[in-house]
């Protein structure tokens, strides 16, 4: 079986690692530029960027299954193109991908189908948005409606900051076209929870929960990033919280998908906020989270490819996904200066100490390139250092122990992944 995985992050490395465990897979193509093909058996790196190039490659190579990790390509309609050519692809069609591609569209969908979420208003006119600032309380959340690599959300503490943010997004175009429409949203103070799930548009099966760490600096301070680390499962995802999530968010979402006849097969990532004992939906992502995937998939006992095939066959109602009774911690090692300005091309040492196929200590490549059997930095987020242990405390300790075994110039990582929620000494 030939599998094509599209996307360049640590998420795609984790997907490839998990898929490669299925004995039916004899070839994996990585449309990435990421060097993870060097550490996964029968994996070939191919340099393809556009959906048309990827489609033509899949036709030429007779690829059996394509898995898309990149949100940009999903919103661009890559799934629709594959389906028009009778090729099997795992991911949402263009219509469903808009639940991530447009926060304004997603919020309207939530409101229409009774998904519990924060109060909001959407604006395409900056002057109307500025007038609205006089009618609300602070802090307030301002979101660029379009795709902004996980960085298009600002918490404005007062009116002055809010107006500056609107100017940045709508006039200065700091997020390009993503900021043409903005969502101004009620601020919810609480704990964020990430829940990945898989759907065939008939049922939604949640995965185990996770806790992302979005900010660049300790204690959740500094600039937004794509994510600096993850723990799974999330200690705050109790049975009561899970029941409220299913009743007030998951079930209404499924109702909306059916009512809108979206009819897709793929991942739904629920970004949740627990505030005052209630569970709210902050956002949908319509693909695996990064870095959540890197912590969640190693805890999946079930064969991921079989789970995907069940979804493609509209048979999710007849399967159960099994999970390890363990915990995972993922620490992101980034290039110094990320998420603003950073160097590329620095040699990475210490990777030879780890074999992700034979150990509960795993290294997933993100911004990594290979030259002459040596690995170099090639992006902002460079590596995902993951440890799986019987307790969260041990997983955190082991992950940081492993981080110290790896080195590259000006490497940076947060020192408190998981420790805001679990007291750990390391």
From Swiss-Prot:
Protein's GO biological process? 'de novo' IMP biosynthetic process; purine nucleobase biosynthetic process
In short, the EC number is: 6.3.4.13
Q: Which cofactor does it need?
A: Mg(2+); Mn(2+)
Question: Cofactor: bound how, per the entry note?
Answer: Binds 1 Mg(2+) or Mn(2+) ion per subunit.
**Residues that bind Mg(2+), according to the entry?**
283, 285
Q: Which domain of life is it from?
A: Bacteria
Show the taxonomic lineage.
Bacteria, Fusobacteriati, Fusobacteriota, Fusobacteriia, Fusobacteriales
Protein's name in the database = Phosphoribosylamine--glycine ligase
- Which UniProt key words apply to this protein? ATP-binding, Ligase, Magnesium, Manganese, Metal-binding, Nucleotide-binding, Purine biosynthesis
Record keywords: ATP-binding included? yes
Classification via Pfam families: GARS_A (PF01071), GARS_C (PF02843), GARS_N (PF02844)
Q: In which pathway does it act?
A: Purine metabolism; IMP biosynthesis via de novo pathway; N(1)-(5-phospho-D-ribosyl)glycinamide from 5-phospho-alpha-D-ribose 1-diphosphate: step 2/2
Give the main EC class. ligase
Report the residue ranges that make up the ATP-grasp domain in this protein. Answer: 107-313
Enumerate the InterPro entries for this protein: ATP-grasp, ATP_grasp_subdomain_1, PreATP-grasp_dom_sf, PRibGlycinamid_synth_ATP-grasp, PRibGlycinamide_synth, PRibGlycinamide_synth_C-dom, PRibGlycinamide_synth_C_sf, PRibGlycinamide_synth_N
Q: Which reaction does it catalyse?
A: 5-phospho-beta-D-ribosylamine + glycine + ATP = N(1)-(5-phospho-beta-D-ribosyl)glycinamide + ADP + phosphate + H(+)
């Amino acid at each position: 079986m030939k599998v094509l995985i599209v996307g360049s992050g640590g998420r795609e490395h984790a997907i490839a690692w998990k898929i490669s465990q299925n004995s039916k897979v004899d070839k994996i193509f990585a449309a990435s530029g990421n060097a993870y093909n060097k550490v996964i058996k029968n994996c070939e790196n191919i340099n393809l960027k556009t959906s048309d190039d990827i489609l033509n490659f899949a036709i030429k190579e007779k690829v059996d299954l394509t898995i898309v990790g990149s949100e940009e390509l999903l919103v661009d309609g890559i799934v629709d193109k594959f389906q028009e050519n009778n090729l099997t692809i795992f991911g949402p069609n263009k219509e469903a991908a808009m639940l991530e591609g447009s926060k304004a569209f997603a919020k309207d969908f939530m409101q229409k189908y009774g998904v519990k979420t924060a109060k909001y208003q959407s604006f395409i006119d900056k002057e109307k948005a500025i007038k609205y600032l006089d009618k609300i309380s602070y802090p307030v959340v301002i979101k660029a409606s379009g795709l902004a690599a996980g960085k298009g959300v600002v918490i404005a503490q007062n009116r002055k900051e809010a107006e500056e943010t609107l100017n940045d997004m709508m006039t200065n175009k700091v997020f390009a076209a993503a900021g043409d429409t903005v969502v101004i949203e009620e601020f919810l103070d609480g704990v964020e929870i990430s829940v990945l799930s898989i759907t065939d548009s008939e049922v939604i099966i949640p995965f185990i929960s996770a806790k992302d760490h979005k900010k660049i600096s300790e204690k959740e301070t500094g600039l937004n990033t794509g994510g600096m680390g993850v723990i799974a499962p999330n200690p705050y995802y109790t049975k009561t919280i899970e029941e409220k999530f299913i009743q007030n968010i998951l079930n209404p979402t499924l109702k909306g998908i059916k009512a809108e006849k979206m009819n897709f097969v793929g991942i739904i990532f629920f970004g949740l906020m627990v505030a005052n004992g209630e569970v709210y939906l902050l956002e949908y992502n319509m693909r695996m989270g990064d870095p959540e995937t890197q912590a969640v998939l190693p805890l999946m006992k079930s064969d991921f490819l079989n789970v995907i095939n069940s979804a493609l066959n509209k048979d999710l109602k007849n399967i159960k996904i099994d999970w390890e009774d363990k915990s995972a911690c993922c620490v992101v090692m980034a290039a110094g200066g990320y998420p603003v300005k950073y160097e590329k091309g620095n040699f990475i040492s210490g990777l030879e100490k780890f074999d992700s196929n034979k150990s509960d200590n795993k290294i997933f490549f993100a911004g990594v390139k290979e030259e002459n059997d040596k690995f170099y930095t090639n992006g902002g987020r460079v590596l995902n250092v993951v440890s799986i242990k019987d307790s969260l405390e041990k997983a955190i300790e082991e992950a940081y122990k492993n981080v110290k075994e790896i080195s590259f110039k000006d490497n940076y990582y947060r020192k408190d992944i998981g420790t805001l929620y679990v007291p750990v000494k390391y």
